[in-house]
A protein has these predicted regions:
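DEDD superfamily 3′-5′ metal-dependent exonuclease/proofreading module
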Residues: 1-172
Length: 172
């Protein structure tokens, strides 16, 4: 039994390198570069993606790659890259206090009741959570958690939100 336990402990040391994957996922890296790349998809559409290259603080034993929804992660021995698609188009910023807003159908936007009092009643209706928004056009990056503010969505109940990809963000 002692020899068996000794061999187990001895070979467990070989498994410690697997923990280096967790270190990368927990932010143990240095960002080396980031850039916007243009690409042509299989269906012929063009798009952009933001590519971040990082130096791992701890080497990993083997290359590993995975795709989660729109994110693509490739962890190499010493370097990791993350590819995030850039969404270009129009998104909605949803106001949380929709009871304080009117929705203007013709303009497809919500405005605060204090301002909407100057709009004819026939052109306004009480806003609902799903239509209490303003529209914003531009380039956006997706996020699963509300890290970057303000956050935008395609639809009210979408799980993935977006933040605007501003020049300040790209140069920081």
């Amino acid at each position: 039994l002692r020899i068996h336990n000794y061999e187990d402990v001895l070979h467990m040391i070989d498994l410690l390198s697997v923990l280096s994957y967790l270190e990368v996922l927990n932010g143990q890296y240095t960002i080396l570069s980031h850039r916007i790349d243009h690409y042509h998809a299989y269906d012929g559409t063009e798009g952009e993606e933001w590519i971040i290259t990082m130096q791992n603080d701890y080497p990993v034993p083997r290359q590993l790659s995975c795709k989660q929804d729109c994110f693509y992660l490739m962890i190499g021995k010493n370097r990791t890259s993350l590819r995030i698609p850039v969404y270009e188009g129009e998104l909605h910023y949803f106001y949380s206090n929709y009871r304080d807003y009117y929705y203007l159908k013709k303009e497809d936007m919500a405005i605060h009741k204090s301002v909407a009092s100057f709009v004819d009643k026939e052109y306004r209706e009480n806003a609902k959570a799903s239509n209490c928004y303003t529209r914003k056009s531009g380039k956006f990056l997706p996020q699963y958690n509300s890290v970057m503010q303000p956050e935008f969505r395609k639809e009210y109940k979408d799980k993935i939100s977006y933040f605007e990809m501003t020049d300040d963000f790209c140069t920081s």
